[in-house]
Amino acid sequence: MSATAPETTKSSTLALTVGAIGVVFGDIGTSPIYTMREAFSDRYGLVVSLDNVLGVLSLIFWALMLVVTLKYIIFMMRADNRGEGGMMALLSLVLRATRRGSRQRYLLLSLGLFGAALFYGDGMITPAISVLSAVEGLEIATPALQPFVIPLTIVVVVLLFMLQRRGTAAVGALFGPVTLVWFAVLALLGLLNIVQNAAVLAAINPLYAVAFFADNKFAGFLALGAVVLAITGTEGIYTDMGHFGKKPIRVAWSLVVLPSLALNYFGQGALILRDPQALSHPFYYMAPEWALLPLVGLATAATVIASQAVISGTYSLTRQAIQLGYCPRLDIFHTSESEIGQIYMPWINWTLMLAVIGLVIGFGSSSNLASAYGVAVTGMMTIDTILAFFVITTLWKWTKWLAVPLLIIFLFIDVSFFSANVHKLLHGGWFPILIGVVLFTLFATWRRGRGLLMKRLAPGAIGIQPFIESITQHPPTRVPGTAVFLTAATEGVPHALLHNLNHNKVLHERVVLLTVQNEDIPHVDDSERLEVEQLAPDFHRVIAHYGFKDEPDVPSALELARQHGLEFSMMETSFFLSRQTLVPKMGREMSLWREKVFAIMARNASSATGYFKIPANRVVELGTRIEL
């Protein structure tokens, strides 16, 4: 037993490492297709010279080292919430570390929520620029195919999104190996060109980056807007930490991804110095002519895999936002019986698809799309730094002498990248910012609206003890079976119970008041799932606890109630739900237009029946009209 355990550990680490290469690093792994080309595009005015090429290469190399390796691989992955990472995990840590109602809590939550909203803008641009840049390789192989680049890109995008409902379980096992081959090809192409001009390796010296700024001044600073393309996808390293673990991600980055990326970028630099005409598409010109079409095919596969990771990440982020109370319920379908994280959300899927197609048609080329790329990414990077600094100093009590220098270094880098991308706002960068602002408004409106709704319901609530005393003194007619009343409040009598009693004049033999409560941790163990309190004979309050990455399942939770002495038979249990009809009204607590938006969101939210996996034939819905 002891002899085989290490082998099992090694094999599982290897499998997770290969998986991480496919999912975590797909986005950053496809950046070499367009990054060097953009750095020397006309918009930055850089001429191809030895100093400029070495300067750009040095900036890219040290961006990979400082931002990806030092900040995310080493630092950010320490700021985890019980092993989980990402903006929502950071937000939940902020909730835990701040006092309810404080101004500090409000500002940090608003900042984190805006960072999460920016992810959606990034999630729209990534599939568009990735797939389009790959298919553009056809122009190099066969110029006659140039008119078909946009249509072929749209076909690939449509197929990608249409396959989402079937899930990625069948082909997911190929993601890691295919991306591993991709990184091997990146390294090989880079090496083949480096050996023809090894002088480019001098760019490892950061003094070339410093000299680049000194020589090019403001134009050199603006070129950071292209350099940042080399580190897009870094948020995925932090977000997917819970899926693969810290060690596999760090091993994959250190042994495979970083060396392959560095070699490829240096190889492109060597090619440009040897043949400046290759600047129109240095990535594809690195390959021999006979390998162009296979390379286009492999690049398309790699960009589809990178896009899949972003799409799955968008689903996951949305589900977490729902759990944390920032988003209305949406339909969620599971596409795998074994992997709980593999989900499909139709509304998100088709919205993303339309946005991606619109971007492909509207911008027309990956070069034009690159002008819109970077603003959202650098915004998220900056917000990550601020929230992580707050968490490690407040929650984990890191000493200021260690935390402050790190904050200064990371913020200086993040703000520099963000500032260099601000000029892109007029050239398409407004799009992800607009998406972020709209979604931030919707998230904040939903959160505020739910709080306002609970406030409106509170004055009409009846205390549980007076209610029990009333039905004890004047017992209503009791009918066989169990009634479960879902309620968001953990105090008072649910409106659905009062409506049922007023209209039907009966009460079931057993009554359960059930509240589903979402916690600021990723997962809650089954042993801690339920709180059961007996309020009176055959009258109980049950609180079911779920983490923000858990899947609420009321029937399964009630099965656990047996451990607390409560037996449930689904065929003898009725579930009573309240459905509110919201009426916007001019008030001081929320503007009328936001109340109208909240009412629309509530009206279009998916049914609690399906979301909580309650059998539809056991549900009774009772309506309530509420003025906001």
Map each language-model feature to its residues.
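The structured alpha-helical core of multi-pass membrane proteins
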Residues: 1-628
